[in-house]
A protein has these predicted regions:
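Enriched for short, Lys/Arg-rich terminal
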Residues: 2-5, 63-95
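Arg/Lys-rich, positively charged N-terminal/basic patches that mediate binding to nucleic acids
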Residues: 1-29
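A secondary-structure boundary/capping signal
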Residues: 43, 56, 74-77
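Histidine-centered metal-chelating micro-motifs
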Residues: 59-60
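A short, surface-exposed loop/turn module that caps and links secondary-structure elements
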Residues: 28-54
Length: 95
């Protein structure tokens, strides 16, 4: 199954600051996601409803906005991606 992948600005900003090879890997990962492949996993607890795509040491957080559309929301290094995303997510909910 093929999906439309909508890449949000925080993902573009993150990818732009990477070196060329990781940048290419992220683009390949997003293409794999578009065709329903890749190392994907649903997130749990306060991040339920979101998913992660693993690309090397990087993670892309995404969600389904329709049965055929995915929104790539956030990307960061594995060591901090979830806490930074959750912090942003909770902050936006409170405002």
């Amino acid at each position: 199954m093929k999906f439309t992948v909508i890449v949000k600005q925080p993902v573009y900003d993150f990818v732009r600051r990477l070196a060329p090879e990781p940048r290419r890997a992220i683009k390949r990962g997003l293409e794999a996601l578009r065709v329903g492949r890749g190392d994907r996993k649903p997130l749990e607890a306060t991040l339920a409803g979101y998913y992660r795509l693993r690309v090397g040491r990087y993670r892309i957080v995404y969600r389904f906005i329709s049965p055929q559309a995915i929104e790539a929301i956030f990307a960061e290094e594995r060591s901090i991606v979830y806490e930074v995303f959750e912090e942003e997510f909770v902050r936006k909910l409170r405002s």
